């Protein structure tokens, strides 16, 4: 664990904020500093390294039998704004430690071992899980706004399409990840095996009200959009709690227009 912690802190040097949190946005200077640190360790471990236009760092280590399919281990190196040390980076550090332990114990796998540090897993202008979607051919480069968004990062849709790799030579993909909920923690368990992951559906909801004087319009005549939105949020939360623990509901952003006049009490 000491080597994993050492690698985590090395990655964490890049994008560390004064409050102790971490910010490594996709394609950012801090992201590529972490990228370079991981690439350096890959080379020290004897891996052949490569990168792609999607911003992924990739390491390849030969097994006993080159004809065997690859075992891939990895995670992402970017973070949410003011994120934690472990999210994503823990999986990359853990993958590197797997190879280190194999070499230290002179264990040679039958299969090749590949390690990925993915870019742009978190929400961003080009879409979340971007790096892994790029290598699996799941990026829709024709979606509105994608061309302009990726060009801001110095790349073209064609370059992203070229990131796709052959998947028939992959045996499996493994990822070590921190628990982002509280189930294992509450049950005092150290580790769990994931059998399914969250499927995210996002909606933009508009509540249309009627603008009027904030101080003199009587309550019976008000049609405040924020009141309607508050009721929608409360009802959505209530419905999800009545179903089961496999469904969650979150509202992350509210924008009120014109929102020019406020009354304070």
Residue ranges, per PLM feature:
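Short coil-to-beta-strand
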Residues: 4-7, 66-73, 200-205
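Active-site metal-coordination/substrate-binding segment of hydrolases
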Residues: 39-43, 48, 58-151, 168
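Glycine-rich, flexible beta-strand/loop modules in the N-terminal catalytic cores of phosphate-handling
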Residues: 18-28, 45, 211-217
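Midchain, well-structured core segments that form catalytic/ion-binding scaffolds
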Residues: 120-129, 133-265
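N-terminal capping segment at the start of a domain
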Residues: 1-28
């Amino acid at each position: 664990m000491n080597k994993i912690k050492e690698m985590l802190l090395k990655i964490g040097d890049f994008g560390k904020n004064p409050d102790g949190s971490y910010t490594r946005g996709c394609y950012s200077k801090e992201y590529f500093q972490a990228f370079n640190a991981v690439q350096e360790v890959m080379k020290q471990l004897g891996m052949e390294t490569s990168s792609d236009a999607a911003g992924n760092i990739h390491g390849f280590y030969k097994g006993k039998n080159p004809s065997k399919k690859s075992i891939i281990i990895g995670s992402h190196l970017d973070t949410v704004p003011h994120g934690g040390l472990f999210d994503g980076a823990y999986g990359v550090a853990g993958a590197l430690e797997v190879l280190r332990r194999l070499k230290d114990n002179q264990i040679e796998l039958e299969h090749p071992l590949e390690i990925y540090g993915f870019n742009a897993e978190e929400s961003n202008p080009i879409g979340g899980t971007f790096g892994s979607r790029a290598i699996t051919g799941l990026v829709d480069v024709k979606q509105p706004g994608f061309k302009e968004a990726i060009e801001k990062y110095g790349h073209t849709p064609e370059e992203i399409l070229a990131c796709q790799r052959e998947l028939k030579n992959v045996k499996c993909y493994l990822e070590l990840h921190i628990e982002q909920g509280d189930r294992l923690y509450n049950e005092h368990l150290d580790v769990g095996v994931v059998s399914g992951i969250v499927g995210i559906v996002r909606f933009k909801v508009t509540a249309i009200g009627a603008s009027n004087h904030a101080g003199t319009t009587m309550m019976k005549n008000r049609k405040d959009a924020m009141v309607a939105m508050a009721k929608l949020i409360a009802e959505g939360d209530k419905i999800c709690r009545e179903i089961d623990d496999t469904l969650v509901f979150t509202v992350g952003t509210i924008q009120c227009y014109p929102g020019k006049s406020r009354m304070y009490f």
